[in-house]
Amino acid sequence: MSVRNRFGTAAAIALMTTAGAVLLSACGPENGDSGSTAATGAPVTAAPGGGSHSGRPAPGGKEVNGTSAANHLTISTGTRTVAMNGTTVDFGTVVRDLAWSPDGKKVVFVDGDGNLLTAAPDGSGRATLAKAPGGETWSHPTWQHADKGPSGGAVPDETDRYNNIVFTADKGGVLRLEKVPAKGGAVEELAPHNSEGGDAAGAPQPPQTGNTWANAGGQQADIAYANTPAGEVYIYDDYIRPATRDIGKGSQPALSPDAGSIVFVRSVNGHDHLFTRSTEHDRTAEKDLTPSATTDYTEPAWSPDGRTVAARTPDGISTVPADGSAAPAQVSTLKGLPVYRP
């Protein structure tokens, strides 16, 4: 059945208390640990190599890493080690909710104390980007970014203005999106809204609380996120003027690298399925990538070429073609948060 969602886990572990599961909605999975739960004991060195395609653990209980330089897949498991390139890298501290910079040269994650850290891919150069205040839980950072537009000046200083880490902050059970400059600076709330003019004129304002699971994509600072009370997925775009669009029922969204498509989780007949659709306003058709699911597929991530979606299952990590042309195949027995290095 549905796994638990993660946005309250990091602080709960850091404070060594027990947190209850928080349901996203009846339309999506419950918030689960997904690599944000710290494991005890020594780091495990994963075996390099391929994967099992049965959707079940490898025969004999053998651990299958499933990551490689070719497939760009990485897996953070809530321990000190992160699986990548067919092996594991020891970061010297607990790594939860790892995300990559747009150029693949840095990672950002939540450490065992609940703070935001950045580091090089080999775990070196760790730096504290921001410290979580007491009583707040931070989770699921994503690296927002924008490229210089073709006009060169449509949005002044867009590369610096949108070079941010966006994450979820949970204070007293109230969820909000917050952001901090990737180069360091003050933490401030990111409040998705609609401007009073332009295409969003007259549109209702989206919820300001209950927002979680931000995911950045594309070259114009787009952010997908979920709203827990509504059980809805949204896309926020303030590149030219603020505009927030309701994509529909679901949770745990991820934008494709070009921001042209979105994948999200929705519960169907007792299991969590993966759905995709275009982000274009006039293309609302959805496709179930897992129509015959007999297990839960959660926490999806796009490959750099946009052709593959990886997702967590109770048995590890599976991948599925983004066009739905084949059934999911298990590639790793490691249980954690899948994310692709650009």
Language-model segments: residues:
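Sequence signature of WD/YWTD-type beta-propeller architectures
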Residues: 2-342
